[in-house]
């Protein structure tokens, strides 16, 4: 926890202050209700799916060239009159997770931030992003993803959780999503994103 927080806390405060404030508030709320935690633990917990990519840079060089994380999700989206009966979007997503962590992705969170767009997402307790990657925004954008297994390249830049949350909240178009997701892309939790509007 300390090592993850040491690597990402400063960046979180500097580049994603709103998310840091949310995580600090989550920690305060947990503590006030008898669940002892720290903002450092909340940052590490939000980085959970990115840890295998990040950790490969901390271990021997062989792990940076081989393997990578396994597939974790599968998704499907059909958009438009040529693909669906009524021209509306059809979207499906399933998660390939172990019971130990998958059991916690059982929250549907409706978030209406002071700035940006309201959105609904499937998520886990104390997360500021979906992680299970299924969401719908008030801007009319639906999103999900399918993981790219075996992807190894990683650079310490902005984690996927911060980038996709920023896109969900502030993205006005599919082009915005592309720009936000590609900006400072670290390569962590590699996946193919499917969006519809």
Task: List each language-model region with its residue ranges.
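N-terminal mature-domain region immediately after signal-peptide cleavage
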Residues: 1-175, 180-188, 192-196
